[in-house]
Amino acid sequence: MSRIAKYPVELPKGVEASIQPDQITVKGPLGTLVQSLTGDVNVAQEDGKLTFVVANDSRHANAMSGTLRALVANMVTGVSKGFERKLNLVGVGYRAQIQGDAVKLQLGFSHDVVHQLPAGVKAECPTQTEIVIKGPNKQVVGQVAAEIRKYREPEPYKGKGVRYADERVVIKETKKK
């Protein structure tokens, strides 16, 4: 059995989990998330905890038990607390603003970039050069942040571009004669 899967996932107050043979659904104050299950891992709910047991003794089943436990733990955290990712816009004239369910970005192009947000994801702009992406699904929040960053990745000479708040951009030295 995977070392990660040995530990049960505790369900905090306000979070419910329902287990069907092919999927697990986690409901909480911030939304509902669904994860498909494989036949290699059995999930049981007892005393407000979810336990993961390997159905057969294959290497694949062992690996899937740890993966599934981590995914479900992220689902429980997401529907109770949520996830957020912060982006900074570094550059002269780089700005962001929220327009309904989209983020409008001015990134030095001749046109504005409008990025549509998927369902369940919210964005805030505390300042014109900061974007905070929030949502219950960790994968989707990270994906949206990566897509926005992809429009103008930080360049290595001046550091201009869209970067994660915790990202360190290593600045290269320019070529000398």
From Swiss-Prot:
Keywords: Ribonucleoprotein, Ribosomal protein, RNA-binding, rRNA-binding. GO terms for biological process: cytoplasmic translation. One of its GO terms (molecular function) is rRNA binding. The keyword Protein biosynthesis does not apply. GO terms for cellular component: cytosolic large ribosomal subunit. InterPro entries: Ribosomal_uL6-like, Ribosomal_uL6-like_a/b-dom_sf, Ribosomal_uL6_a/b-dom, Ribosomal_uL6_bac-type, Ribosomal_uL6_CS. Part of the 50S ribosomal subunit. HAMAP family: Ribosomal_uL6_B. Belongs to the universal ribosomal protein uL6 family. This protein binds to the 23S rRNA, and is important in its secondary structure. It is located near the subunit interface in the base of the L7/L12 stalk, and near the tRNA binding site of the peptidyltransferase center. This is Large ribosomal subunit protein uL6. The lineage of its organism: Bacteria, Pseudomonadati, Pseudomonadota, Betaproteobacteria, Burkholderiales. The gene is rplF.
